């Protein structure tokens, strides 16, 4: 990911859950909050309730969806993407549409492809 680093610390996830804006749809919940850095940071959460490791890894294709659309998403935000149980039956295109829809509702999508 060219413009993004990852969120790994538990307290960073909790801060986004409590203080960030959120948007939910059938497959995902996306939390976002402006950060002070010029880079975006992203974290992914897939619960054990979703399924065994193979299913959870299949849902983690969200990383690739984000990577492909990274230039369309505004920079300087912390994002957490939480997969819902229904995501295990979704195909790649449904997850992509759900992610982009949530980002659009949060006002994260930009017109150009430079991400500024």
Predicted features and spans:
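Positively charged, solvent-exposed patches that mediate nucleic-acid binding
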Residues: 1-116
């Amino acid at each position: 990911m060219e413009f993004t680093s990852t969120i790994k610390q538990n307290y960073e996830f909790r801060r986004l859950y409590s203080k960030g804006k959120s948007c939910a749809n059938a497959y995902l919940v996306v939390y976002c909050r402006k950060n002070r850095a010029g880079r975006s940071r992203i974290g992914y959460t897939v619960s054990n309730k979703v399924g065994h490791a193979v299913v959870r890894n299949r849902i983690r294709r969200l990383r690739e969806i984000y990577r492909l659309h990274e230039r369309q998403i505004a920079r300087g935000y912390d994002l957490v993407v939480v997969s819902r149980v229904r995501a295990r039956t979704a195909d790649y295109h449904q997850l992509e549409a759900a992610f982009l829809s949530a980002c659009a509702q949060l006002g994260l999508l930009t017109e150009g492809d430079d991400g500024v």
